[in-house]
């Protein structure tokens, strides 16, 4: 696995596009790791301090993710080094998409990512540049549909990703108009844990869960885990957190989901960050879901989690451990050798899978249950393949990487 991994990590990307904004200090990169299957896909992010290496490592991460989620295409990523809070953000994005739109028409598909919104920024700005849909390049390069299929499937994509949930099994509150894109990644993280117990043995109901991050992914994963009978015992995010060793009720978690303030936990009894950070990592628990930023979990925190009884980690965040390696550094390796580590490219592939599902065939209707169950089944299949190669609860991530990399190297 190590050999395959270093081969994949060190292989030069097929295409790197570099951009410098003439009017601000913004700069950006598109990295297309490969045009496997004729196209590549990966979102567009913006943050201060982003560099080409970050974009390249995320493009490689996407390529691995597509081996699970489909379609069988290359990985890509776009990144802009600029402050997303700057009032000139929209102008910067307009000039950026004007520059990259020829790729988006031909062989590259993008979407929203960190600090870049799919619905309010990516779709309208790419449309202004003559791109039918941000995924048009994947249609043209990979699926090669005829015109009527293309129109139909672009319609499916547009409606599917922003479909308002009307099934109470998937929506915390039908009156709030939550959409597929709000919930699907967190749903996949929860499903990956349920499937882990289903395949390797054990029972999710009653298990104690620690959640890091209360954005779309963490809050939705916690909601669906609580719905399945798990007990959320601790939540930490950048503003503070909550700890309840006997576990919050499903109703309390539902309320915390509904009351969140954008991507932040919002509760009257919120503990400050210092207090919660001192307690969180030592709270007795069975499951930990890192759903905050990348490369945050230190070795000391991992050691505390293991000592607290954590035996399953499902990676809601991409590359959650504070390793410098693109995929699998010493901290990730220690986690994988000590407990059941479900890797990011399986656990958080929900959104990528929805894209593949909506693009690959002409559907009779768009149905919440069909979309969510398809994502769940995709995650189940990936874990089942892993189990066929390794029945131990240790080394799951290593085995899963091996299966993915054999398709790519």
Regions found by a protein language model. Name each.
Residues 67-72, 77-204:
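Glycine/serine-rich phosphate-binding loop and adjoining beta1-alpha1 elements at the start
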């Amino acid at each position: 696995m190590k050999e395959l991994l270093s081969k994949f990590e060190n292989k030069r990307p097929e295409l790197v596009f570099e951009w410098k904004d003439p009017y601000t200090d913004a700069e950006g990169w598109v990295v297309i790791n490969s045009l496997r299957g004729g196209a590549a896909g990966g979102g567009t992010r913006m943050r201060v301090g982003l560099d080409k290496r970050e974009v390249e490592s995320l493009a490689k991460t996407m390529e691995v993710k597509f081996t699970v989620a489909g379609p069988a295409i290359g990985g890509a990523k776009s990144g802009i080094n600029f402050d997303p809070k700057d009032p000139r953000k929209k102008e910067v994005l307009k000039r950026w998409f004007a520059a990259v739109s020829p790729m988006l028409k031909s062989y590259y598909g993008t979407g929203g990512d960190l600090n870049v919104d799919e619905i309010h920024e990516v779709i309208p700005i790419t449309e202004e540049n003559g791109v039918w849909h941000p995924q048009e390049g994947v249609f043209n390069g990979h699926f090669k549909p005829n015109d009527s299929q293309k129109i139909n499937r672009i319609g499916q994509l547009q409606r599917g990703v922003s479909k308002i949930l009307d099934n109470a099994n998937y929506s915390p509150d039908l009156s709030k108009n939550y959409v597929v894109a709000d919930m699907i990644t967190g749903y996949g993280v929860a499903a990956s844990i349920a499937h882990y117990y289903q395949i390797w043995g054990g029972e999710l109901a009653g298990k104690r869960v620690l959640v890091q991050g209360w954005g779309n992914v963490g809050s939705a994963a916690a909601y669906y885990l609580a719905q399945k009978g798990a007990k959320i015992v601790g939540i930490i995010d950048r503003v503070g957190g909550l700890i309840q060793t006997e576990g919050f009720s499903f109703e309390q978690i539902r309320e915390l989901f509904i009351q969140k303030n954008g991507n932040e936990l919002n509760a009257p009894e919120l503990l400050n960050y210092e207090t919660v950070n001192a307690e969180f990592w030592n709270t007795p628990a069975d499951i930990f879901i890192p759903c905050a930023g990348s490369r945050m979990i230190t070795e000391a925190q991992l050691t505390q989690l293991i000592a607290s009884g954590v035996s399953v980690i499902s990676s809601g965040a991409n590359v959650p451990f504070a390793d410098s390696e693109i995929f699998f550094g010493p901290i990730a390796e220690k986690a994988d050798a000590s407990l059941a580590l479900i890797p990011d490219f399986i656990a958080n592939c929900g959104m990528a899978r929805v894209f593949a599902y909506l693009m690959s065939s002409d559907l009779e209707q768009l149905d919440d249950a069909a979309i969510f169950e398809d994502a769940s089944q995709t995650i189940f299949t990936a874990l089942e393949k892993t189990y066929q190669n390794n029945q131990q609860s240790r080394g799951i991530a290593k085995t899963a990487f091996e299966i993915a990399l054999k398709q790519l190297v």
